């Protein structure tokens, strides 16, 4: 199942990379500088997509095998949001992505690198299934002894029959992006594994009038202010 999925979903970007690279190496006088830039950008985007896929594959393998040692420490949610937004891919520029925190001093106990990977996966997922120039919002607020973090988009939402299976490994919605790429169904499964390792839960709900809200919890850090 894994090998079948990998061979199917790596073929499209690899074919695109090799085809575009071949065109660039040919000395075609009709190939304008603008077209060369477009082909170079396409190669970069395909390579970046492959890199994300391999990162998710390696990460979820380590999580499933218990090979990840969590480096838990208190982190400011605002700092985590800022870091994630600063390292988003080129595709993110076509969307309006905002981040809001209910309390500037809101903190949670986490492995920052892993939680940032969760947020990047959720944001990339929202980018994948929403039209260009749509809005994606990150929001965090205290909820008892936890912090609830939400990634909300204004796309088509999640079919009712898919919500319970969405975080299963290799499950996809069956939708293919306009560029022919289709995920392996690892990103959300990895998110669930990481959140569960932190003692939290993750789920998804549809929002009115349309869109989806992916929510997960982390243990809240108690902040004591001294006069």
What kind of region is each of these model predictions?
Residues 45-50:
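Short alpha-helical segment of the dimerization/phosphotransfer core of two-component systems
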Residues 65-70, 107-110:
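Conserved micro-motifs of the catalytic ATP-binding
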Residues 71-76, 96-106, 143:
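Conserved catalytic submotifs in the C-terminal HATPase_c
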Residues 126-127:
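Short helix-loop "hinge" at the ATP-lid/N-box region of the Bergerat-fold HATPase_c
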Residues 146, 158-172:
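Short conserved segment of the HATPase_c
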Residues 187, 191:
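Short alpha-helical Gxxx[C/S/T] motif in the catalytic ATP-binding
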């Amino acid at each position: 199942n894994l090998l079948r999925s990998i061979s199917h979903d790596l073929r499209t970007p690899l074919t695109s990379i090799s085809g575009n690279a071949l065109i660039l190496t040919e000395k075609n006088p009709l190939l304008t500088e603008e077209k060369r830039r477009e082909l170079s950008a396409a190669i970069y985007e395909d390579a970046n997509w492959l890199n994300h896929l391999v990162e998710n594959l390696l990460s979820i393998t380590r999580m499933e095998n218990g090979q990840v040692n969590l480096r838990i420490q208190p982190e400011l949610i605002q700092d985590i949001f800022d870091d994630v937004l600063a390292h988003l891919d080129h595709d993110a520029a076509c969307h309006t992505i905002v981040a809001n925190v209910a309390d500037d001093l809101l903190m949670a106990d986490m492995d920052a690198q892993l939680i940032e990977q969760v947020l990047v996966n959720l944001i990339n997922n929202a980018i994948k299934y929403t039209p260009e120039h749509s809005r994606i919002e990150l929001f965090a607020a205290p909820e008892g002894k936890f912090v609830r973090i939400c990634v909300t988009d204004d796309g088509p939402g999640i079919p009712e029959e898919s919500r319970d299976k969405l975080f299963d490994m290799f499950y996809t919605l069956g939708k293919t992006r306009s560029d022919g790429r289709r995920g392996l169904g690892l990103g959300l499964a990895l998110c669930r594994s990481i959140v569960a390792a932190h003692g939290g839960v993750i789920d998804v709900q549809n929002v009115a009038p349309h869109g989806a809200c992916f929510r997960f919890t982390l243990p809240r850090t108690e902040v004591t202010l001294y006069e």
